[in-house]
A protein has these predicted regions:
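Alpha-helical secondary-structure segments
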Residues: 38-42, 117-118, 163-214, 253-262, ...
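Ligand/substrate-recognition segments at binding pockets and active sites
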Residues: 242-309
Length: 407
């Protein structure tokens, strides 16, 4: 429903009328889902969806007890008192701001009994704070973003190249909403300034991270040399700049670039190139900030240009690209991109899925909403005194039923 504002709603859009219901054009009774009998549910799709059976395994499709749902008076799932759990664990406490606690279910009759008596999930958006807690031993395991330092006394269980890092433009900003200005900036970025910065980072021009797949194959490897990129072209940049000034009715433009300190030197060199091409009519201020500060500014829409990571919690390239349908990190919106994603959701073959993803990626990069520079890895780490915790694929799947912590 529209009022849920769910970031995962697009996973259901393959169902007949789901997207129209979410946009408020139709009522919930129009959804293409019916029951044939007590044990059979029927889904009518708006168009063929190659990975629909896989989607049915995800939390968005989890069934619930109807009597219990109705008894909750509209608060189902909003707290531990409004949940019905029948797995190896049950939710015993939940503070949406700080943590969620689950305990072993002594009535569970499945074959696999839970080894830990309880597990606490701590909510912390700060990469620096998470690293400190792991070092101090107050966390047993965590996902570390590419910005987080490797904590002491931890073991890296797995890595995932799930982040693209580069220039991001706030398309909701009065200046950066101008496509000609964004094209002027992107077509005059000297990629050679931004060499490799360490073991956790490598040059990359595509937006979709290497962790994403499409049509059963790795998307980044499959598109290969077709990876889109805006090429350096000083003459074209100068033309775009003149067009931007004309469209904005200005003879001078000033804006601010937020960046982490480790890339400040390169950004300042890039600033010199921009000023050489665009002249004295361009004024740019470079402000350094921590990754947490930059993320907070982006979340609040309080920025113009930022160098930051664009992380994917998804294994699917389709889901990653669809997450920008409502503007996403770029605050870029338009019916044309929404239509591209809608068509992508309804393709028949794996080949069409790949080409559709490439079309969507090309559209975003061609509109200069961002300029990727690097690919980066997130890590799943555990404390050295923790065993039996591992992840499957993306950050959405972690197994801890056999977890142990040694004193």
């Amino acid at each position: 429903m529209p009022e849920t504002n769910s970031s995962h709603a697009h996973r259901l859009f393959a169902i007949e009328n789901a997207q129209e219901i979410y946009s408020g054009k139709l009522g919930a009774e129009s959804l293409g889902v019916t029951t044939q009998d007590d044990y059979t549910i029927v889904f009518r799709l708006a168009a063929p969806c190659p990975d629909f059976l896989e989607r049915l395994t995800e939390c968005e499709f989890m069934p619930c007890n109807e009597d219990f749902f109705n008894a909750m008076g509209g608060r189902y799932g909003l707290g531990n008192k409004y949940m019905l759990c029948n797995g190896p664990f049950y939710v015993s406490a939940w503070d949406p701001k700080t943590s969620l606690t689950i305990k072993a279910n002594k009535f569970y009759s499945g074959a696999s009994k839970a080894k830990p008596s309880s597990v606490i999930f701590s909510f912390d958006p700060s990469a620096e704070s998470i690293s400190k807690k792991l070092t101090a031993g107050s966390l047993g395991a965590a996902f570390l973003s590419p910005d987080a330092p490797q904590p002491e006394n931890t073991v890296t269980v797995s890595e995932s190249v799930n982040s693209s890092f580069g220039f991001v433009f706030n398309c909701a900003n009065a200046l950066m909403s101008n496509k000609e200005l964004r094209l002027a900036l992107c077509s005059s970025i000297d990629r050679s300034l931004f060499g490799s910065k360490g073991s956790n980072i490598a040059p990359q021009s595509g937006l979709v991270p290497r962790s994403c797949s499409a049509g059963g194959v790795n998307y980044r490897e499959s598109v290969g040399s077709q990876t889109p990129a805006i090429q350096y072209d000083a003459a074209a940049a100068a033309t775009h700049w003149k067009n931007a000034l004309s469209q904005l009715g200005e003879d001078k433009l000033t804006f601010t670039v937020l960046c982490p300190s480790w890339v400040e030197e390169q950004v300042r060199r890039q600033l010199q190139i921009w000023q050489q091409i665009m002249g004295i009519g361009l004024g740019v201020t470079v402000v350094t900030a921590t990754a947490d500060e930059i993320n907070a500014a982006i979340a609040a829409g309080n920025y113009q240009v930022a160098l930051t990571g664009i992380d994917s919690p998804y294994e699917s390239a389709v889901d990653f690209l669809a997450s920008f349908s409502d503007g996403g990190i770029f605050a870029f919106s338009g019916n044309e991109y929404s239509d591209i994603i809608k068509r992508l959701m309804g393709v028949d073959t794996d080949g069409e899925l790949l080409s559709g993803c490439l079309t969507a990626e090309n559209y975003l990069l061609g509109n200069a909403v961002c300029y990727p520079l690097y690919e980066r890895s997130s890590r799943f780490v555990t404390s050295k005194d923790v065993d039996g915790v591992y992840m499957n694929g993306s950050e959405s799947t972690v197994c801890f039923i056999y977890a142990k912590r040694y004193d």
